[in-house]
């Protein structure tokens, strides 16, 4: 068993890394939370790692939401509808995730990481218009997308921003910056719903979660400060981080392939 002090340092450091990457490049950073909790911090049970990671992602998302809200980036009507509707999917997805064997779930998680990496490698389109009418009809169009994104978020215990942001842009036509800001309410709420579902089953390590979150807050501040200086190199940073995700994804697949692909 890992001693408490080294494990605490690993949790703080891992949280700092996730927070730093989130602050530096935005969406996709939280995908590393579960692998870090498993293979660096030393949580032995996959479901506990997923539940603990979901709680950490939730807190970080709400913290980032405050900054975006102050800048006027959040379109609250659509954000609230998306979060409320998607929470139903998150509860259903997390319930299904708890029922699946841990190694099988991690193998699927590894495949998801490859998808996230591929999406990060795609060039982002710049949207400059912000005149889209956000009436209730437009917002309700996002319900189906919200249910799907929430289910995926709950199933894997991730933020799901890589699904939510394009989903909001597709359904409402809102600019990227508003989709990013508005998505954070959903990311935080989905993560909270997933964490509560796992907590009911005793599948959260609260001490490690607190340490991971603490490291994430500090790392996030550092990442945001550095992001300002490296704004012109954002695409390069995305490619580098996508490559890191691919490496970790193959490691996760390798570690859990025996359960899915028995020889």
Label the model's feature ranges.
Residues 1-21, 34-46, 66-152, 170, ...:
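Juxtamembrane transmembrane-helix boundary motif
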Residues 25-34, 157-167:
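Transmembrane helix boundary and interhelical junction motifs in multipass membrane proteins
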Residues 170-176, 180-185:
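Transmembrane helical segments that form the transport core of multi-pass membrane transport proteins
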Residues 53-57, 183-187, 208-213:
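Short hydrophobic/aromatic, small-residue-rich stretches within specific transmembrane helices
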Residues 46-50, 180, 184, 238:
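Small-residue hotspots at the loop-to-helix junctions and early N-terminal turns
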Residues 52-66:
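Transmembrane alpha-helices of multi-pass small-molecule transport proteins
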């Amino acid at each position: 068993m890992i001693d408490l002090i080294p494990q605490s340092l690993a949790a703080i450091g891992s949280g700092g890394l996730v927070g730093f990457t989130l602050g530096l490049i935005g969406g996709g950073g939280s995908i590393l939370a579960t692998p870090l909790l498993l293979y660096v911090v030393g949580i032995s049970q996959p479901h506990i790692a997923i539940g603990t990671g979901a709680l950490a992602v939730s807190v970080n998302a709400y913290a980032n939401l405050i900054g975006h809200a102050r800048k006027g980036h959040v379109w609250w009507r659509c954000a609230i509808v998306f979060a409320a509707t998607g929470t139903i999917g998150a509860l259903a997805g997390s319930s299904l995730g708890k029922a699946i064997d841990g190694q099988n779930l991690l193998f699927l998680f590894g495949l998801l990481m490859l998808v996230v990496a591929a999406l990060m490698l795609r060039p982002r389109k710049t949207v400059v218009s912000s005149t889209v009418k956000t009436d209730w009809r437009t917002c309700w169009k996002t319900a189906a997308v919200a249910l799907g994104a929430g289910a995926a978020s709950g199933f894997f215990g991730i933020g799901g921003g890589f699904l939510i942001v394009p989903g909001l842009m597709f359904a409402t036509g809102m600019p990227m910056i508003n989709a990013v800001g508005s998505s954070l309410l959903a990311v935080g709420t989905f993560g909270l719903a997933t964490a509560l579902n796992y907590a009911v089953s005793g599948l959260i390590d609260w001490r490690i979660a607190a340490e991971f979150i603490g490291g994430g807050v500090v790392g996030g501040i550092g990442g945001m400060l550095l992001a300002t200086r490296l704004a012109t190199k954002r695409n390069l940073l995305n490619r580098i981080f996508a490559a890191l995700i691919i490496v970790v994804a193959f490691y996760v697949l390798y570690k859990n392939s025996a359960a899915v692909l028995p020889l």
